Amino acid sequence: MNIKHKILGVVALSLLPLSLSAQSEMEAFRLGSPHEPVGSARYAALSGAMGAVGSDVASLVRNPAGISLFRGNNRLSLTLGGGFSTDRGVWYGTSTSQDMKGKFLFEEFSYQAGTNRASRGPVSFAFSIRNAGRFDRELHASAVLPQSANFSSLADFSAARTNNARYDNLRSPNVDKYFEKSYITTTAAFKNDYVPWMSILGAGAGWIDIDNGSRSYRSAYMYSTAPDGTPYPQPSIGLPDKADLVLREKGNITDYDIALGFEANDALHFGAALTLSSLDYEMASFYHEAFRGNNYLKLQNTKSVSGFGGSVGFGLLYEPVEGLRLGASLYTPTFYSMKMDFQAGSLGRYNNKALEVATPKSAANSYALRGNWRFGLSGAYFIGRHGFISADYDYTSGSLRLSNSTYDEYDGSEIGFEEDNARLKTNFGGVHTVRLGAEAMLSNRIALRAGYRYSSSPVKNARLKGDMASTEVLVSGPAVHYTLPDSQNSYSLGAGFRITPSLSLDLAYVYSDTKARTFAFPYVNDYGSYLNASDADIRAGKVKPDELVGMQAIKETNQRHKAVATLSIRF
């Protein structure tokens, strides 16, 4: 165990105290970031590089114009997929892993009516129900914390959030009363907009205590001697010896697509798709810190989110010379209406006294979430009837935006989410995705396929790119942990079999490797030393908060193995 050393920072955006209502930046990022649909087995085998290949209904997520290339009468397809994954975490040198066994699940169902200018005209139609992405994940991480490193405890974070809320409202009436310990340890405080719930959970469980001389809060885990028994000149704040984080997530996004394709001539095709999306997400987490003398703190969270939204996509394909096909596509953001509910409980033990507190049974609220724009370019070269090679490029904009769902105007109101949206724009940028695919026809009945996909990290702010964050992020209520994804790579293989003229079977295997960094709680600036600051000092820039750096990131690697099968029938 070591003693906390505070470092003075400079005044900048990342040093400003946070609005109490701005707590959903990371939730919006988690739910609104791009997800990779499995699609059909052919789509999976080509790693999604089907923007200029088309024909398959799954290709409409890359370019809706592709469905106009299906020239059969009707086709029904059903796709199932399953597999397993391993989630590994390394935290302060301690490695842990968790295996998740899978089962075969629904991936896609589709119906197509193809283009036939002789009998139907140049218009094609497609309908599909698709698993557009799953949130399933399980992380178990443990750390033996070093004696000499500079880090802070969740108790320090709770105290800083309390001090910052008080600093934000120094000139508000009754603010002193609202932050008295006798008040924030009552259930009435949960209904007070001035008081963060992390303050109530920390004070109620005995993690934090007030320094009556300065009016600021600090960690309650105070010690008079070092671990070896050497006396301190004065009681000092202690840090934990060990930490544990268990995180479980599950849920999925289901897309319902209706698409039309138009074949202007043999070389030029257009398409449009309407997508309705249903989102379900559940999270449960447990965090624990162990201090000297059998003292500890614990935090438990559960959260559920449901949402429904819609988007549209447009695409075109052009064949400038025989065998070469080029495509472009544009997809609007998905506009979600979201409902969230959560519960949290905290426990603490210090000096043989154990305390606990829980949030109200229901903390339901609603908001609106606008997703990202997406732009795509694609190309494919067909080698007669022997096969093809294809390449797709996607750019997903970093334009997530939260708004208040109680407002009726078209784009909603940012009231209560101004800071979240500002930080989403500052911290995250666009994602670049490259897909490569190839198909070789061994005969008229058998095809072999392979593919590769790479996606860049959406993290833009350099102060969030290291193992220790050096700027604040806004977390959702007491669920203070957050994850920042790094790059993603996936590799795929597959085969297609024409069993009869009307029946076909496609198979695929996909291996993906995703890296991420998970933080137990955010970096934060503590304004507790300036609760008596004058307006003149604030205007003169003399307020320089203490930096609490949090803990080192858990370096996470998720490896997934997936098998996909599609059965299609033409009629």
Where are these regions (language model features)?
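Short amphipathic alpha-helical segments enriched in leucine
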Residues: 47, 51, 62-65, 568
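Generic secondary-structure boundary/loop-capping signal
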Residues: 43, 57-58, 64, 364
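Glycine-rich nucleotide phosphate-binding loop and flanking beta-alpha elements
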Residues: 67-68, 84, 266, 278
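Outer-membrane beta-barrel translocator/receptor signature
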Residues: 54-62, 68-147, 254
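Outer-membrane beta-barrel porins/channels
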Residues: 23-38, 44, 114-571
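Transmembrane beta-strand segments of Gram-negative outer membrane beta-barrel proteins
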Residues: 25-50, 68-87
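Bacterial Sec-dependent N-terminal signal peptides
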Residues: 1-27, 571
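Short, charged, low-hydrophobicity "junction" segments
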Residues: 16, 48-58, 423-427, 482
